[in-house]
């Protein structure tokens, strides 16, 4: 399905019936990255998942954006569809977006689920910004390969620093603004019940970020998955689904 939000053609999916659950994907991903969660939750809830601007089938913004812009866009998207989420599930940068939007009072869910949420900017930020250099090197080193092979190899190159933080073409400046925006002060404002799910083997967003958010968000609970990647919901779908279902009930 498609809808025009803030002059951007926006692709989304809405399935199931019941209370509304909003899914927010991470940087470089799209709504398909959370499809397993959508399918599971749709048995009990109305699940809404969208491609954020610049990703999937949604048009890219024409100016440089940061988390605030994405937060305002998310509010406008929900208003357009007249939806009031009971819960928000955010993965990686989608988690940082959820934290920021709730702190700005643009979202007002009853419950929040953060899957390997980013948004804590420490010494690793410079490393992540280095993706711009990796992107340039990747382009130069793989231009001669077939397009499908080229894309896979570049993703491996980017994945060396964190696959969720891929530098999408034409969004490099937006990427820079996003990874510079720390949401720890926003997290400290949150009081709603929050489930944190992190992996102890995540190389993109370290487990210490989960512990930090657990301390910052007063009414939060941290669940640690052993041995999973940054895409913990794909590596351990049954475990993650069980945790989310129990938390939202």
Task: Write out the residue ranges for each language-model feature.
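Alpha/beta-hydrolase fold catalytic core
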Residues: 1-21, 42-45, 83-84, 110, ...
């Amino acid at each position: 399905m498609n809808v025009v939000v803030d002059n951007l053609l926006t692709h989304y999916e809405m399935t199931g019936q019941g209370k509304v659950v909003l899914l927010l994907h991470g940087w470089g991903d799209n709504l398909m990255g959370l499809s397993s969660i959508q399918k599971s939750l749709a048995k009990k809830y109305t699940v809404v998942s969208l491609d954020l601007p610049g990703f999937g089938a949604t048009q890219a913004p024409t100016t440089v954006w940061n988390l605030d812009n994405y937060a305002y866009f998310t509010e406008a998207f929900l208003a357009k569809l007249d939806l009031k989420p009971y819960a928000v599930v955010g993965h990686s940068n989608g988690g940082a977006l959820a934290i920021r939007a709730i702190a700005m009072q643009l979202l007002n869910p009853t419950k929040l689920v953060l899957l390997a949420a980013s948004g804590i900017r420490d010494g690793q930020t410079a490393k992540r910004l280095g993706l711009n250099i990796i992107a340039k090197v990747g382009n130069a080193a793989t231009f001669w390969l077939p397009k499908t092979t080229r894309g896979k190899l570049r993703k491996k190159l980017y994945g060396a620093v964190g696959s969720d933080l891929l530098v999408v073409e034409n969004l490099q400046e937006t990427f820079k603004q996003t990874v510079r925006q720390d949401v720890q002060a926003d997290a400290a404002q949150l009081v709603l019940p929050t489930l944190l799910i992190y992996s102890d083997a995540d190389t993109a967003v370290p487990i210490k970020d989960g512990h930090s958010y657990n301390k910052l968000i007063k009414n939060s609970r941290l669940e640690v998955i052993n041995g999973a990647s940054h895409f913990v919901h794909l590596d351990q779908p049954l475990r993650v689904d069980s945790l989310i279902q129990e938390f939202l009930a």
